Amino acid sequence: NGFIGKNGMGKTNVLDAIYYLSFCKGTMSASDAFNLRHNTEFFMIQGEYESDGMGATEVVCSLKRGTRKRVKCDGKDYKRISEHVGKIPLVMLSPADSQLVTGGSEERRRFMDMVISQYDAAYLNAAIRYERTLKQRNALLKAEEEPDRGVMDVLEEMMGADAEVVFNARRNFVEEFSPIFQRLYSRLCPDSREQVTIKYDSHGFRGALQPQLASWRERERLVGYSLHGVHKDELVLELNGYPV
């Protein structure tokens, strides 16, 4: 299927809506608030998916200003929105994908998150918990008063446990994806002698995260944020052994 139309007619908006119904968030807006039209109180996106052997599935995402976002599948509300991710697998291709090569490491982490979260619910839940705990720890690191050691110990223990889940899933993904990437590159550039590789760089290769957080706590208070963890992971792209 294809969408044909003049500029500004909403072709990209249709694609973004389809993406939203799969991931419960858009590709272009950092916040759901930007999806609300000016002087309106709510928005709703509704779609019906059909697949071989599964029949039709109706998905509805809605948000009323000042309230929690709601997601329904075949008329049933999800208790947690993350439960829906992966039910309707989807891959989004756009000109912005060039950022996977030219952009910062957060773009490549986002790519891994998008793929892995669609088939590994434990990964998605661990990643969400990790980001939430990371924000709490960073807030304490920025505080003028010295943070409570007991609270920091608990947060670092939680981060360590979730980081292990995230690290293992990302490492396994890169190991499986790397030969696929190399094979597709060879098909696109059959006459090229260039060797392309993807490598995963993570704190996980240096051991458990919790001891690292504890040992760096005082130094991280000086900068006001966490210097170690899977939020610093990198997907390194190499051409003939050199970073792209």
Sequence positions of predicted segments:
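Alpha-helix boundary/capping detector
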Residues: 40-47, 138, 142, 239
